[in-house]
Amino acid sequence: MTHPNELPLSPLSALQFYATAPYPCSYLEGRVARSQVATPSHLINSDVYTELVRAGFRRSGVFTYRPYCDGCRACVPVRVPVERFTPNRTQRRVWKKHGGLIATVAPLHYDEEHYALYMRYQSARHAGGGMDRDSRDQYEQFLLQSRINSRLVEFREPPNPGYAGHPDMPGTLRMVSMIDILGDGLSSVYTFFDPDQPHTSYGTYNILWQIEQARSLKLPHVYLGYWIRESPKMAYKANFTPLEGLFDGTWKVLDPAAPDLSPVDAAKGGSRGLRIDRG
């Protein structure tokens, strides 16, 4: 019989948590934010990080945090239950439209072409926000430093037939995505794509691709970070249904249209099986 003092400790028991000083909220103008940070970072391996993500944490490089704001609960951690996800008509069209993209999964690594696309994306989508001036070192610290099981995925067009004399010439780079592989799912870290291609919905395609990958790996969830009703930048996440949100430590199906963000009956959220037209 195991003595109570010999019971296995929680994976989080060796960590310490502290709250940051207040800082301007990057999502809601005029708001003040705080974060709760998990330390020390060298103890946060893939198993520990899986538990932290289940508790609503995210990471930026080796910095692991979750919202810890005074009097505000606008940030809702969300995830897609893979086997219950049903793509809508628009998502099926996006999947078919970009089905020819070639996805290559690799360890995190620096590539000058990736960095150039990142800077174009930031300049077009987030001009004046600071990230459009990121140096190569800042880019690496943000996206290429990880102590857990992380991958870089690049999406390219098929090689141009005009380069028949150069069989190793890759197709045009359209998108790069960083993902973490957890014990119970994939976690979408960050994605940037070609901003000069209008109305492409690359971001939507990326999430659909991650859902398919999770399904093939028999992982039940795709974690999408935080959803904020008042933030237009976050609106796309509500299109992936059913969507689960973390409420008081429990994951429940979320109704984005509910005035009080009340969870809904899970039996009403979506149907089983992923039905994406591959044609």
Swiss-Prot record:
Signal peptide: none
Broad enzyme group: transferase
Main localization (coarse): cytoplasm
GO MF entries: arginyl-tRNA--protein transferase activity; leucyl-tRNA--protein transferase activity
The keyword Iron-sulfur is assigned to this record: no
Reactions performed catalytically: N-terminal L-glutamyl-[protein] + L-leucyl-tRNA(Leu) = N-terminal L-leucyl-L-glutamyl-[protein] + tRNA(Leu) + H(+); N-terminal L-aspartyl-[protein] + L-leucyl-tRNA(Leu) = N-terminal L-leucyl-L-aspartyl-[protein] + tRNA(Leu) + H(+)
GO CC annotation terms, alphabetical: cytoplasm
Subcellular location per the Swiss-Prot or TrEMBL entry: Cytoplasm
Enzyme Commission no: 2.3.2.29
InterPro entries, A to Z: Acyl_CoA_acyltransferase, Asp_Glu_LeuTrfase, N-end_Aminoacyl_Trfase, N-end_Aminoacyl_Trfase_C, N-end_Aminoacyl_Trfase_N
Function according to Swiss-Prot or TrEMBL: Functions in the N-end rule pathway of protein degradation where it conjugates Leu from its aminoacyl-tRNA to the N-termini of proteins containing an N-terminal aspartate or glutamate.
Sequence similarity: Belongs to the R-transferase family. Bpt subfamily.
Annotated protein name in UniProt: Aspartate/glutamate leucyltransferase
Organism: Paraburkholderia phymatum (strain DSM 17167 / CIP 108236 / LMG 21445 / STM815) (Burkholderia phymatum)
